[in-house]
Amino acid sequence: MDQLKPLEHMKADSNKAICKNPPNGNDFRNIFQRDRDRIMYSKSFRRLAGKTQVFFAGNDDHLRTRLTHTLEVSQIARTISSQLGLDLDLTEAIALGHDIGHAPFGHVGERVLNYFSNGCELYKGFNYREKTDSIVVNGVEILPIEFMGYKHNWQSVRIAVDLTRHRGKQGLDLSRNTIFGILYHTALSYGKCPHISAGYCKLRERSKERKCGNPIFHLDYYTNNYGEYQDLRYYSVESSVVALSDEIAQRHHDIEDGIRASLISEAELRLKLMDFIKLSTSEIPEEKHTFSNDKEDFITILSGLFVNFYVSKTITYLTEQFGQRKYKNIEELILNPDLDTVMKNIEIYKVVEGDEQLHRFLKERILSSHMAQVMDGRADFLIRRLFKAYI
């Protein structure tokens, strides 16, 4: 008899999954397989090919788009779930759908759209009206709170539930487990606005009236219309696997793209990596200590080393968190009144010691680099011009 894998007892059960119209007898697939296929064949998924990450896709044919990132997240997540004994179909469905609502131009696109929808910048005909019960900012009335906010994970849910049509019907009719995983792959809200200082908005430095009448980034449109999908009864360990895989993929492609764009030298990264992963320990096979002088060979070897290290740490961490000594099955975990706290403990910086320092290094050298800032500035400009053109 084959030995059970570490978290096979926590595997999500497709037979217990809930959606509006379950698969009928003529469908060869279970509900999670159907979720995966519907996402994969949707227009929203195909559009990911035209959405870039940190750099514009046209800058280099080998730099990533949101689609290639999604496929990498799926591959990493499937590897982890396979080793743990979790449901591969649910894992893949969540991974393929997690970014279908993402803005173009990466997180700068998301940031600008959120500013617009929160009235941080005013465009008549779009985000402010006259004679309404809306919030007053700088003497003009902006959108009511119930229409405010943009965040890509919430938008992904909106696309899956409402905006996409399938066979003439509204929405993809995905299972609650898949939608939950898509929603919870990142934070549900923004932190404190970084542009407010003593009640004044730094974004309005050239404006006569700089007071901010809306200090909170509202997401009320989403929470009012899609708040039901926050129900913790539909949590799965598979959703945590995808959330961690998303972070792993982001670190991985930041490093690769940074090397290709010459933002980080191979020598510097080699030293940083040696310090971070501690190659002298027995965790990494001895033969992998040798790096090639060829850039592409170096990137290939580095990628395998880096991802394998993170995947190994993730498997170990999740086994410790959800092993049989703690929970008999997923139902027992879901009934745990401290489930929300358990979920918050599944963070990449807790999984991999030193990740916060690595992330800070990558942010300083790549995301905050002159090249990335130029690209972000262009993206910001393009989105603003498009808004003015369409309003």
Question: Model features per residue range: what roles?
Answer:
Residues 1-80, 88, 115, 121-154, ...:
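Histidine-centered, transition-metal-coordinating active-site segments
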Residues 38, 94-96:
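Short, functionally critical alpha-helical segments immediately adjacent to catalytic or ligand/cofactor-binding
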Residues 84:
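Basic, low-complexity intrinsically disordered segments
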Residues 93-94, 242:
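Active-site alpha-helix of zinc metalloproteases
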Residues 97-105, 249:
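Short active-site segment of divalent metal-dependent hydrolases/proteases
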Residues 105-109, 113, 253:
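Active-site-flanking alpha-helical
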